[in-house]
Amino acid sequence: QDYCAQEGQQEVQRKDLSDLERYLRQSRQR
């Protein structure tokens, strides 16, 4: 169960990172 929870957290972190990168790229273009 802990392993599944860790995997889920990692996936969420990856999604947050991709969103953050997208946001940074947009702000850089301005």
Swiss-Prot record:
Family label: Belongs to the 2S seed storage albumins family.
Record keywords: Disulfide bond, Seed storage protein, Storage protein
Function description: This is a 2S seed storage protein. Inhibits spore germination in R.solani and F.oxysporum. Exhibits anti-trypsin activity.
Subunit architecture: The mature protein is a heterodimer of a small and a large chain linked by 2 disulfide bonds.
An MF annotation (GO) of this entry: nutrient reservoir activity
Coiled coil: none
Name of the protein: 2S seed storage-like protein
Organs and tissues of expression: Extracted from castor bean.
The keyword Disulfide bond belongs to this UniProt entry's keyword annotation: yes
